[in-house]
Design a protein with these regions (language model features):
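Secretory targeting and sorting signals
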Residues: 1-29
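Beta-strand-enriched cores of mature, soluble protein domains
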Residues: 30-194
Length: 194
């Protein structure tokens, strides 16, 4: 199991939480909505050849801006901060390690695709400490931190509300130290608790 895919799935869950598990969303003159989220989950997986349970908690806040003028009011920019703490336990042995991360995500101004009134291109920037993985003694074993930039083509559906459908995405660039970005997560699990 590749690390980047598992991390992206957790981050996507946080994004969904931002839109569905909000606590007292509010808005000011330039915002569609803003709020906070706080959620926990537990899951057991066996992709590494034995049962590993992840107990996790993430919190964050988000702001969705009102539709931007350059897109005819159709694109709503998201800014989000997420913090995650998790413990991974080998169910057979009780051995465990912890992982934490904190990221800041922001969508840059979007541009309408020529000839369209709902399809936009947008870049996203995400920065932070992507992973700090510690063994059971608390020693840092892996750490990833830096910046990621992606470019997306997105159909807003022309309904003047946040959301829509992704059409394509392209990785643009990265900077920083990425010990875990494309690592074999099961190799890390085996090393620390296998």
């Amino acid at each position: 199991m590749k690390r980047s895919k598992r991390h992206a799935a957790t981050l996507a869950a946080a994004g969904i939480a931002a839109l569905s598990l909000t606590a007292a969303p509010t808005a000011n003159a330039g915002q569609w909505e803003s709020g906070t989220f706080d959620d926990s989950f537990s899951e057991t997986f066996d992709e590494c050849g034995y049962d590993v349970t992840e107990e996790a908690h993430f919190v964050g806040r988000y702001t969705i801006s009102k539709g931007t003028k350059k897109t005819g009011g159709q694109f709503f920019r998201l800014r989000q901060q997420v913090s995650y703490e998790g413990t991974f336990t080998n169910e057979e042995t009780g051995a465990y390690f912890t992982e934490s991360w904190k990221t800041n995500y922001r969508e840059m101004p979007a541009t309408l695709v020529d000839g369209s009134d709902s399809i936009v291109t947008v870049q996203t920037k995400e920065s932070g400490v992507w992973d700090t993985i510690r063994d059971s003694s608390g020693k840092v074993r892996y750490r990833s931190a830096g910046n990621l930039v992606w470019s997306y083509v997105f159909d807003t559906l022309g309904d003047s509300t946040p959301g829509g459908e992704g059409i394509s995405d392209e990785f643009v660039r990265t900077s920083g130290n990425w010990q875990t970005w494309d690592a074999d997560f099961c190799a890390i699990v085996d090393e620390l608790i296998g």
